[in-house]
Amino acid sequence: MRHIFIALALSVGLSAGLAVPVAAKDADQKAIEAIITDQIAAFQADDFARAFSFASPTIKGLFGTPQNFGAMVQRGYPMVYRPNSVRILELREVDGRLWQRVMVTDPAGATHLLDYQVIETPEGWQINAVQLLPQSGVGA
């Protein structure tokens, strides 16, 4: 399932485009940060239904149920499921899509960078993809 999630992230063109920092409206920036941190908090509470509520219709369609989604995150993204710390970094635009970079430290002290693609829907901002970035000495 992790491969599906990463494939989705790659299919939207992250690797093909040029990343440009975004000067998002303050309200949008705060809302984007909130959906990511709120989803992580829901995972920490094992509230998969709440975590699933932050996912886009595309992600909901891929996984079908909060339980399937939660199981995928537990197996494929353990650093998101049980982080030691979370730091929101820059918001960027790549090929017209918004990507929020997040730095997560896992319980063992390893640092991970993730890119969250977010989309605006009638329900507000939602997470449409997450890509775990390759390790490159982050935090060293």
Over which residues does each language-model region extend?
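Exposed beta-sheet edge and beta->alpha loop/turn motif
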Residues: 90-140
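Short, low-complexity N-terminal intrinsically disordered segments enriched in polar/charged residues
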Residues: 19-45
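Positively charged n-region of N-terminal signal peptides that target proteins for export
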Residues: 1-7
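Alpha-helical transmembrane segments and their juxtamembrane interfaces
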Residues: 12-13, 57, 125
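Short solvent-exposed beta->alpha transition segments
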Residues: 30-34, 38, 48-95
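Bacterial N-terminal signal peptides
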Residues: 7-17
